[in-house]
Design a protein with these regions (language model features):
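C-terminal edge and immediately downstream basic/flexible tail or linker adjoining helix-turn-helix-like DNA-binding
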Residues: 2-3, 95-98, 124, 152-158, ...
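Sigma70-family region 2
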Residues: 43, 56-71, 91
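Structural recognition of an alpha-helix C-terminal capping motif at a helix-to-coil junction
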Residues: 50-57, 70-82
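Arg/Lys-rich amphipathic alpha helix in sigma70-family domain 2
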Residues: 65-67, 78-98, 170
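A short pre-motif secondary-structure segment
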Residues: 139-143
Length: 183
């Protein structure tokens, strides 16, 4: 993977004549990292690729709104997380599933996904995460998997650090309770 300097990408994105090149660099630089952010929220490979593609389309169409005040990855992450959450909300509206069936369907979906390389414990963890309310799920995912600092999350999600810490603590507690009840 090529490593491009954030400032170099920003500079290219700011000039109409170099935007395309800057955007190509941006896609090469951040695709994998964004894919995993999306995948942890959306769960399946195919859906994650769709959401990632929508993320880059939105980013390209919204280049004029990017002024370079934040890091490129922060801007892209915000778009990716919003796209992921929108996708999950739409899926919830489509799928009318009882509460008992919803948990096992997450595990079944993951185990059937040819790109899922986890074991049953990982599938159960994903079930537990999927059962969390949206905000707690997002905060847990960003903190646990991406090891994102609360200060970064605060900027990304426009939420206070204290609120994020509380959401993470509650999410961890709920996940622990989930595993205790599924022993």
């Amino acid at each position: 993977m090529n490593k491009y300097d954030d400032n170099q990408i920003k500079e290219l994105l700011m000039k109409p004549e170099t935007q395309r090149k800057g955007f190509e660099m941006l896609v090469r630089q951040y695709s994998e990292q964004l894919y995993w952010q999306v995948r942890r929220i959306v769960l399946t490979h195919e859906d994650s690729n769709d959401v990632l593609q929508n993320t880059f389309i939105k980013a390209w169409n919204g280049l004029s709104s990017f002024h370079g005040d934040s890091k490129v990855l922060t801007w892209l992450s915000r778009i990716a997380i919003n796209e992921s959450l929108d996708f999950v909300r739409k899926q919830k509206n489509i799928a009318v599933v009882s509460a008992d069936d919803s948990e096992s369907s997450v595990a079944n979906t993951l185990m059937a996904d040819e790109y899922f390389d986890g074991d049953e414990t990982e599938a159960q963890l994903q079930e537990a995460i999927a059962s969390l309310p949206e905000v707690q799920r997002t905060v847990f995912t960003l903190r646990y998997y991406d090891e994102m600092k609360y200060s970064e999350m605060s900027k990304l999600l426009n939420t206070s650090e204290g609120s994020l810490k509380a959401s993470y603590h509650i999410a961890v507690k709920k996940i622990s309770e989930f595993f205790k009840s599924h022993d």
